[in-house]
């Protein structure tokens, strides 16, 4: 009997369906970051994944386009970080392989500085801006290995036209990481 390639199924946790007000305008970085932090916190409280949340917003309207939470352990897939899911779902939502559409810029808001993989995916995603909360040191304090991310990594993204704002509501975002640690969350890439 030969091997078969199994279908790839990716789904968000049930609780996410009602977790975002899709028609609401989130006018500030702080308002957008609260969405990402709330997703991360709920993911921890519900026991559905790691302490990371992300959302993509239409820059012109301030409305959310997509959202993702860390789903690595829940779906047995090492690439299912919050940012990756938000990017994939955002591209699916707008019906294009890139979020860079004429007249429609998008911002990726992540509860933590992206790891090396997510930073790379961001480059190709088409977002024109990244906003982050907790920083690499906060994630590393829990023993998460964020991979080879250097100051030059951010400089490169900026040279490619991606604006970066870091440390928005850092304390609130870092508190979700601490909640995950206190609850005995699995550090899957240590």
Q: Which residues make up each language-model segment?
A:
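Zinc-dependent deaminase
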Residues: 1-43, 104, 121-190
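Short loop/turn motifs at secondary-structure junctions and domain boundaries
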Residues: 45-49
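Short beta-strand scaffold segments in enzyme catalytic cores
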Residues: 52-58
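A structural microfeature
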Residues: 65-66
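A short, polar/charged loop-to-alpha-helix boundary motif
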Residues: 71-85
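Immediate flanking context of iron-sulfur cluster ligation sites
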Residues: 100-113
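Conserved redox-active cysteine motifs that mediate thiol-disulfide chemistry
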Residues: 112, 116-119, 124
């Amino acid at each position: 009997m030969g091997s078969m390639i199994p279908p790839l199924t990716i789904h968000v946790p049930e609780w996410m369906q009602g977790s975002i007000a899709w028609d609401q305008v989130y006018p500030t970085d702080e308002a957008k970051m609260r969405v990402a932090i709330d997703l991360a916190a709920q993911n921890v409280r519900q026991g559905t994944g790691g302490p990371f949340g992300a959302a993509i917003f239409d820059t012109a309207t301030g409305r959310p386009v997509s959202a993702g939470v860390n789903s690595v352990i829940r779906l047995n897939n090492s690439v299912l970080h919050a940012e990756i899911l938000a990017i994939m779902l955002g591209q699916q939502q707008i019906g294009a392989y890139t979020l860079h559409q004429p007249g429609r810029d998008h911002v990726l808001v992540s509860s933590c500085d992206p790891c090396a993989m997510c930073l790379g995916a961001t480059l190709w995603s088409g977002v024109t801006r990244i906003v982050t909360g907790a920083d690499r040191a906060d994630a590393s304090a829990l023993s998460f290995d964020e991979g080879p991310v250097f100051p030059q990594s951010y400089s490169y993204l900026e040279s490619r036209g991606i604006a970066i704002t870091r440390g928005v509501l850092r304390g609130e975002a870092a508190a979700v990481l601490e909640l995950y640690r206190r609850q005995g969350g699995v550090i899957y890439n240590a």
